[in-house]
């Protein structure tokens, strides 16, 4: 270990990645824990980590052509009686999408999805139930995807409500905005689903690239806040955000970078 700074690079597909620069305690090495936090602080940290992982998972799997952003709601008379019924409606919808793809011998769909209600633990959690999905179902048209939001069979089949479907258009190589939209209202009751086989973000750790002295100098002279400065450190990447935080207890700086490929292979349909 050289100087006690870890570069933690999270590679999410070919066009998006995040980089954390973390001060290491003297006894830490790659793969070792860095100590324990209080239960409440750890709970908040776990929540932030889960949200970051979701953003990374979305960008690792859905920055590609043909991805659809699907929002499902209910019309009067079709509102589910409770959260569980609403969630089953969405699961059944995703099963119909997968069944139609399999019937046509198309690639297996990939998705992340959430059922959302009102504030959890209150009488409001069954109000305004709705669903958000990021869907990759190559070979299916938008009309077909929308028509599957229904119930019943044959002449009894009818729509459950409104479907808002649009093509994903990543901003600067990522779908952060959509992911954060799905994470909104953290106090609301939510249930998450994802298809099997999604690619995991790739974690790369380097404890020898930077030193504490370097990081301290960059944070105090302002370089650490400059996106152009970091773009020189990571050629072919454009830095979208450089976030610097000072931990008063540890007396050390933490740096978090978000970046995307300057020559993104993405093109809008």
Annotate each language-model stretch with its function:
Residues 133-134:
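Long, low-complexity, serine/threonine/proline-rich intrinsically disordered regulatory regions
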Residues 1-127, 137-269:
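Right-hand nucleic-acid polymerase module
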